[in-house]
Every structure is written in C-alpha cells, then in structure tokens.
A protein has these predicted regions:
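N-terminal glycine-rich phosphate-binding loop and ensuing alpha1 helix
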Residues: 1-72, 119-125
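Short beta-strand/turn micro-motifs composed of small residues
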Residues: 9, 55, 110, 137-140
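Hydrophobic residues within beta-strands of alpha/beta enzymes
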Residues: 51-53, 106, 136
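Short phosphate-binding loop-to-helix
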Residues: 58-108, 115-117
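Eukaryotic complex-assembly/interaction regions
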Residues: 71, 75-83, 136-141, 221-223, ...
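Catalytic-core segments of class I nucleotidyltransferases/pyrophosphorylases
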Residues: 106-107, 114-115, 120-131, 144-287
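Left-handed beta-helix
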Residues: 223-451
C-alpha cells in the first residue's frame, strides 16, 4: 500500500510578529532549517514518492523557491517528487480540489510538527485498522512543562476507550466555556456505552485516509456542502455518520492513535511552542544539524548551542542553549541563554538576552537587556533598553498588508464552533443529554477564541 502526502502551510497567525509576507510560517527557521524541511524529511523517511505542499497564493513564490533551490538541491536521492499548489479556502474543499492529483491513499500533514515518532508507525497503525476504517487520525498529549498551557486549548474529543485494540473517533466539540453544557447524543451512548470524553488530547492534524474518502457521500448526494468546511469538521462528520444512522454497523469509521508518552510531539502554533521546538531539535539525535562554523574571537559557544555559517562573535561573548543563524555579528561581552536568533542579527557590546526570539536583521544596540522577549525582524532595539516578556515590533508596510484572504487551515488555528449548530439540525432534541461544564477540566473562560 503506497501513500501520497499533502502538507498544509497556513499563515501562522499565532507566530506573529515572526512571520511576514517575505517569511511565511513554513519557512521560519527551526535549528537553522526551514520548518517545512522537517515535514518533508518525515515524508522522505516514510518512503513516499509524491508530496503536494499547499499554501496561500501570497506564500507560493517563497515556498516554491525554497523547494527548488533549497530542499531539492540538498537531496542526494530524487525519488520523492514535491509539488507546490496555491489554495485560498477551507481545507475540506482543498482536499476535494486535489482529487485529480491524489492517485493513492493519502497522508494529510501540517507543516509545523516536530516529532521523533517514526512515520512507519503511523502508516502501520492505519494499515492494521479494520476494513471499515476509512481513515486514521493522530492525537497527542502535551509533554512539555515549559509550554504555555493557555495556547493549547484542546477540543473535547469523544472516542471509544484508547485501551481498545482499535480506538474509534466518535465526535469532536469545541471546548466549552466554564459552566457551559456539553450536549451528547443518546443514540451514540446507546451504541457506544463506554464512550470517553477526553479534555487533554491535542489534534496533531496528521491523518491517513483511504482515497475512497474523496468520494464520501454525507447523504446530500453528489458534491455535498459538508466538503466546504475545515478538514477537522469533515473528519468529525464522517465519525458521526458511523453511529447516528440506522445501518451504522456498515458505515465507515475513523480510527484513532495517541502518540505514546516515550515519544515527543510538538506543533509550532504559537511563539512559545516555536521556542520549544528549537530546543527539542537540539536534544534529538534523529535529525542532522548543520555544522557550527562561526568565527569566535575568544567567544565561548556551548556544546548545547548551534551557530550558523558566517557569524562573527567578539571576545568574552558567551552563548548557551541557543540557536544563532547565519551572518550575525555579536559585539564584546554579549550573553545569550536559551535564545533563538535568526539570520543577519547585529548585537552591540554588552547585550544580554535570556529566552528571547530575535527575528531576521534585528539590530540590538549596546547594553540592552531582554528577557523573554520576541523581536520582529528588522526592528532596532535602542541602547540600554531593558524589557521583559514583551513583543517588540514596528509598523512597517509589510505589517499593514491585508492578509485576511490568505489560505488558513485548521492545522494552524481554525475554529468550527458555528458549524456544530448547522450539523445538529437533523438530530431530535430528545436524542441529546447534557453534561455540565463544571465537571470538565477548564483552564480559562475564553476557550472559543483561537486567534
């Protein structure tokens, strides 16, 4: 059984101000390699022969340039064909629109995941599912204590027990606000009395699906409106169909797999997650890091750090647990700890940075002290500035561009809260039971806002 891959590259609104029209999310560097590189390498290790990279029309040119001049030029084997396709719209309609390009069963991937879970494990899980399983989704639990829990916001995932030989997805709901009620259908509980509601499972947005899913009929006949939705909503509707119809025993199902605790998995959907992904790569031995070739004129570069080509550091500068890009210039007595510094950054003398992310081409003048800050590309931090936990950004023409029509996939941060009401029209009120929200582990009362 062979597979094709579709990699979705959203705009990355949660990664502002690091992203820009010139530096889309998929090209943000992680350990001095574009984010997209890791998704492509995962596909390469899976032995896939065909990959379609989907992005917004505004990001098509820089991503195509990277594929042609960057990724392809580094590959000794040309066995995997990579094609870039622009699409502005929902991910459900995107998958349907790619029907002519999808010749095999397919794997849907985000561009922003970092994991040591072997791709063969994911493929084998799907291959071993019962025949009626039309697709398999991957979920994971956050294993990083340093992650900002407020940015995770998992949905309510209803499924058969994970301990079952073949766990099955039954439904997905946006996580409710505190004290809100969750409506659970009686028809589902009659058929699956051991159904479990999970509040800690996070969607990886990795799905393995049979090609026949592209012809799935939701009961509307022909081109159903249900395809004009985010992909997560399409998957949810297929899962619901498996139990809410009279002949549910014959319906297609969606399998589930939860990443084991011994494996790491992270998605770069926020600035804090992006910082952790860089640290995770430094710890993992499964990825080959580029060589450190900085000119260190008496500077101390820790073995737990990575420094790009052409970077120059003056005496008494210290770099620990940090990743520094190419062609940077660091003055005397600079101190970096736990930072990500992108290409072309200039640091004056005596600059101290702790747990910061510094964008491309930033200039930080003498004796500045930044702790936990994110600095937009090309920004100038004035001499002796002292900032803590701030976002430093300017107001450039790039920042004022309207990107509201860009392709936005739920692999980034899409909410389908409004669609639940539309999909419930055919369900009788007597088929619903209510679960009080106070019985659910809720972190805050603004959980429907995923922006």
């Amino acid at each position: 059984m062979e597979f094709q891959a579709i990699i979705l590259c959203g705009p990355g609104k949660g990664l502002e101000p690091l992203v820009s029209p010139l530096l889309p999310k998929a090209l943000l560097p992680i350990a001095n390699k574009p984010m997209l590189y890791y998704a492509l390498e995962w596909c390469q290790r899976a032995g896939l022969s065909s990959v379609v990279v989907v992005c917004s029309s505004s990001a098509e040119q820089p991503i195509s340039k990277y594929i042609t001049l960057g990724y392809n030029s580094m590959q000794t084997s040309k066995s995997m064909k990579v094609e870039v396709v622009a699409h502005d719209g929902e991910t459900g309609s995107l998958v349907k629109a790619l029907k002519d390009k999808i010749k095999l069963d397919f794997i849907l991937l985000p561009c922003d995941f970092i994991t040591d879970l072997p791709p063969q494990t994911v493929v084998d899980v799907h291959r071993n599912q019962p025949l009626k399983t039309i697709g398999t989704g991957i979920w994971y639990k956050n294993s990083l204590d340093t992650m900002d829990k407020q940015t995770l916001k998992p949905d309510l995932t209803i499924h058969t027990p994970i301990s079952n030989p073949y766990p099955q997805l039954l439904d997905i709901y946006p996580r409710p606000k505190a004290n809100d009620q969750v409506h659970v259908r009686m028809s589902m509980l009659w058929e699956y009395p051991q159904a479990t509601i999970s509040t800690s499972l996070l969607e990886s947005f990795i799905y393995v699906f049979s090609r026949k899913a592209l012809d799935y009929d939701f009961g509307g006949g022909g081109e159903s409106l249900k395809w004009k939705k985010p992909w997560t909503s399409v998957v949810r509707d297929i899962a619901r169909d498996s139990w809410r119809h009279a002949k549910s025993a014959d319906r297609d199902t969606v399998g589930m797999y939860v990443v084991p605790q011994e494996h790491s998995f992270i998605r770069c959907k926020s600035v804090s997650a992006y910082l952790e992904a860089n640290r995770l790569i430094l710890k993992q031995s499964s990825y080959t890091l580029p060589p450190t070739t900085a000119t260190a004129n008496g500077a101390a570069i820790g073995r737990d750090s990575l420094v790009g080509i052409g970077t120059v550091m003056e005496e008494k500068t210290s770099v620990k647990r940090s990743i520094v890009g190419a062609d940077c210039i660091f003055g005397r007595e600079c101190r970096l700890s736990g930072c990500v510094v992108m290409d072309g950054v200039v640091l004056g003398d005596g600059v101290h940075l702790d747990n910061c992310i510094i964008g491309n081409g930033v200039i930080i003048e003498d004796k500045a002290r930044l702790v936990g800050c994110t600095v937009e590309g090309r920004y100038v931090v004035r001499e002796a500035t002292q900032s803590k936990n701030e976002i430093l950004r300017g107001y450039s023409a790039e920042g004022l561009l309207d990107t509201s029509d860009e392709y936005e996939d739920e692999a980034d941060e899409e909410s389908d809260e409004d669609e639940d009401e539309d999909d419930d029209d055919e369900v009788d009120d007597n088929d619903l039971v209510e679960s009080e929200g106070e019985g659910i582990d809720v972190d805050d009362d603004d959980l429907f806002d995923r922006s």
